[in-house]
Amino acid sequence: MSRLFVFILIALFLSAIIDVMSNFKVEGACSKPCRKYCIDKGARNGKCINGRCHCYY
């Protein structure tokens, strides 16, 4: 019984960590409009990929 309880606690802990990390990633998305930011820098286009703005020259 105690092994099951420990397993459930570990599963809940890992679930909470994954939930927090996924929320952080959503909030960490590109804060600026990438296309406009990149065009202003002289690039032809820009896209937000994995929370970072990538410019295409």
UniProtKB/Swiss-Prot annotation:
Keywords: Disulfide bond, Ion channel impairing toxin, Neurotoxin, Potassium channel impairing toxin, Secreted, Signal, Toxin, Voltage-gated potassium channel impairing toxin. The record marks K47 as: Basic residue of the functional dyad. InterPro entries: Scorpion_toxin-like_sf, Scorpion_toxinS_K_inh. This is Potassium channel toxin alpha-KTx 26.1. The record marks Y56 as: Aromatic residue of the functional dyad. Disulfide bonds join C30-C48, C34-C53, C38-C55. Gene3D superfamilies: Knottin, scorpion toxin-like. Expressed by the venom gland. Recombinant toxin that reversibly inhibits the potassium current of mKv1.3/KCNA3 channel stably expressed in COS7 cells (IC(50)=150 nM). Also shows a weak inhibition on Kv1.2/KCNA2, Kv1.3/KCNA3 and TRPV1 channels.
